[in-house]
């Protein structure tokens, strides 16, 4: 079995091939996310703690977190699920994945060093790979350099040098800072708030006009009903008086 070990502190990863079944037994029947002591792998691993982050079986099917079995299952996966990338919007597909329990049928096991031991491992903990890109968001640049909200973050952007071309000056490239508070951003915010207040005032005025018109219409309809009621009562009195005069 191959062990793909990574160390986030240095940004390095290295592939180790272990053929001794006794050394690998420490990983068997363990779930993804569990932490394992790596002392059994050798003297250089003494004191190291490894977290199981994934793996593939001998046919290349990946392990999936949450599937509590060591066999292969077919699951209906959609956007947002691991082990699947949809090609169309809303597409779902039934894919074969392996459970999150490690057994002897694994070909590669992905491990992350949680705790470093006494000795350095060549190519993994003794060297450091610098990050190619720095932070892009303004709040993360402030956090990296311990800046306050009033400090300007633009001078602190990590620039990436580009190789010089034929007879040209070497240049560097910097990312566009996201969520940077500038006077234009504040002006747009003020405009949004002003438009919102204007819409609220307009809707309040329209509601008042509608309520006024509704009250007027109700008053007019009530007056019409009362007028019709008076006319009916007057016509009934006239008809009664005419009937009584005819009888005399």
UniProtKB/Swiss-Prot annotation:
Gene3D superfamilies cross-referenced by the UniProt entry: 1.20.5.2650
Biased composition of type Basic and acidic residues is found at: 223-248
Q: Name one GO molecular function term.
A: structural constituent of ribosome
Name any one Pfam family assigned in the record: Ribosomal_S6e
| Modification(s) after translation | Ribosomal protein S6 is the major substrate of protein kinases in eukaryote ribosomes.
Oligomeric state and interaction partners are given as: Component of the small ribosomal subunit. Part of the small subunit (SSU) processome, composed of more than 70 proteins and the RNA chaperone small nucleolar RNA (snoRNA) U3.
What does the UniProt function comment say about this protein? Component of the 40S small ribosomal subunit. Plays an important role in controlling cell growth and proliferation through the selective translation of particular classes of mRNA. Part of the small subunit (SSU) processome, first precursor of the small eukaryotic ribosomal subunit.
What is the name of this protein?
Answer: Small ribosomal subunit protein eS6
What species is given as this protein's source? Glossina morsitans morsitans (Savannah tsetse fly)
